[in-house]
Amino acid sequence: ATEGPDLGSAFLANKSNRMFISRKEKEDWNMYVMDLDKFFADVKKGKVGKPTAYETLLGTFPTSMGRPGGYAIDCNDDYAYITVEREGTEEEKERMAKNAFLPESNQPVKIKPSLCGIRKMNLATGEVTKVIDTEFKTGHIQASRFTPGEIVFCNETGGDAYQRMWFCTADGSVFKPLY
């Protein structure tokens, strides 16, 4: 089920027997959904087809929205929340450099800060919209398993950070440290 070229991450759906798959194809980052009922029926028959027999393209991430990283699927299977690295403005870059986490003097900088953010892809239409922008590197992202639109993610420094975990809502109206 997870074979094929350029496979990114795979997530099982919460509400149906499907699997969401990201693939980097040429210059595009694409999101697919795989019909696991059809796939496992063919496995049982001993006649498994090519991935295209089970996968449907949901959307292509626009390069203008940033460079996609990890993602998480909302508990209702309506949205994928995608971390991105982005260019940003000179003012944002200056603030990021000023506020970046610096390890103790005897520790190396493991991951340099970068301007990032979170975008969401509507898994019914493929539309991608901005959730938030951050002035630190966003790392691991998770969507609530119980409450639609709740997202938790980390400030990725390769180790410690002044504030490691963050919370936001899918509409961007809440963006705060998670204590």
Question: Where in this protein do the model-derived segments appear?
Answer:
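Generic "edge-of-domain/loop-turn" microfeature
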Residues: 17, 26, 38-41, 78, ...
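Asp-box/WD-like beta-propeller blade repeats and closely related beta-sheet repeat scaffolds
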Residues: 22-117, 126, 130-133
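Conserved beta-propeller blade repeats
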Residues: 2-22, 60-80, 135-154
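Beta-propeller domains
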Residues: 130, 134-179
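Residue-level detector of intrinsically disordered/flexible regions characterized by low predicted structural confidence
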Residues: 16-17, 49-52, 122
